[in-house]
A protein has these predicted regions:
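Residue(s) in the substrate-gating loop at a strand-loop-helix junction
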Residues: 14
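A short alpha/beta connector and helix-capping loop motif
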Residues: 5-8, 23-54
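Active-site-adjacent betaalpha module
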Residues: 2-9, 42-43, 55-177
Length: 177
């Protein structure tokens, strides 16, 4: 699947203040998720987020807190298992791009629930993390085995742009420096 900005939604899963310090390479995960969110904002891609038990894990990290138009607080590990999830996704968004934590828990369970429901899912490998890198890698492998695309944030940006003549090309390109 080639990603396109018009049919995408960026879903930020559980990138929370008290969870991220425990995530391996959390600074990279947050930076790549922020790159995606800023590109999504520039290109008009809807941004949504989830927060797993915010009373315990805190709110979305400050680097990303201003981006989502809507945030769903949840307790189910799969975002799809929470009331209100279906309404969280904008109509017409047939490509769901996922960034977040933990890759082997909430990210993977959400992916595994979305795929059989006919959703086209891409997991952004450099924008997902787990406490243990081995868990992250196995989660990416398993998501791929079940039909998810595994992409990088830079792949997403260039596919969303589609062409160097895109009026937002220079602004998005600056995010890669």
């Amino acid at each position: 699947m080639v990603l396109n900005a018009e049919g995408s939604v960026l879903l930020l899963i559980d990138l929370q203040q008290r969870l991220m310090p425990a995530i391996h390479d959390s600074e990279v995960v947050i930076a790549r998720a922020a790159r995606l969110a800023e590109a999504a904002r520039l290109l008009g891609v809807p941004i949504r987020a989830t927060q797993q038990y915010p009373a315990g894990l805190g709110a979305t990290v400050p680097e990303l807190a201003g981006y989502p138009a809507e945030t769903l607080d949840k307790t189910s590990f799969s975002a799809t298992g929470n009331p209100g999830f279906a309404a969280l996704l904008p109509p017409g968004a047939d490509q769901i791009l996922i960034a977040g934590a933990e890759a082997h828990v909430c990210v993977l369970q959400t992916v595994l629930a979305l795929l059989p429901a006919g959703r086209r899912v891409a997991v952004v490998a450099d924008a997902v993390g787990s406490r243990d890198p081995a868990d992250r890698q196995v989660a990416l492998d398993r998501a791929r085995q079940h039909g998810a695309e595994i992409v990088t944030s830079e792949m997403v940006l260039f596919e969303w742009l589609g062409d160097a003549r895109n009026p937002k090309f220079r602004e998005v390109q600056k995010l890669l420096r």
